[in-house]
């Protein structure tokens, strides 16, 4: 199996559904109180593609499904509801979130992240599949220049500085994809009428 660094055609996702999934274990006690334990440290997204608007959409999904060999290969998917590190309705900025990494004058590698914060609760999501050309990075809120000051591994989300930061706060932002695979080996297309085809194609996030 392999991960194919290609984005699922976003033009045929407008009829899709899906979003994040968590795994929680709940035990109900005798008095009706609950004991809740989170099983996963990280969310796992699930999606479903269900409708195609044009003949080209149908050709595209058939070609893509065969190329991925069903569930075998992974690929990128744009989640239209959550694909930017800041607000989903504004362009990413170099100061969206503090990156994960040690600032000590030695370490040069920092992980792109998105932080979801409500009150004192925060979930830090590692961004492993940033979109090429969208990454912006800053030191103490001063925007730096890709290649001149740092490089980005767009297959892992790791930002590598040419010179290790010493005391600065490292921040960054980007657009990103979700690493996924098809969650079926069967492409079950329904011919409801002439040139009208629907389907239920499950897609699930994979850990990379």
What does each of the following model-derived ranges do?
Residues 168-174:
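Generic detector of short, aliphatic-rich beta-strand segments that form the cores of beta-sheets
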Residues 1-74, 178-198:
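Solvent-exposed edge beta-strands and adjacent loop segments
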Residues 62-149, 174-208:
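Extended beta-strand solenoid/passenger and fiber regions
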Residues 52-53, 114-117, 160-168, 206-207:
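Secondary-structure transition/turn motif
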Residues 40-42, 105, 154, 165, ...:
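Surface-exposed coil/turn segments at beta-strand junctions on protein surfaces, enriched
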Residues 143-168:
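A surface-exposed beta-strand-loop module
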Residues 36-37, 100, 160-162:
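Beta-strand-rich interaction surfaces with strong enrichment in secreted/lumenal proteins
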Residues 44-46, 134, 156:
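Extracellular structured ligand-interaction cores
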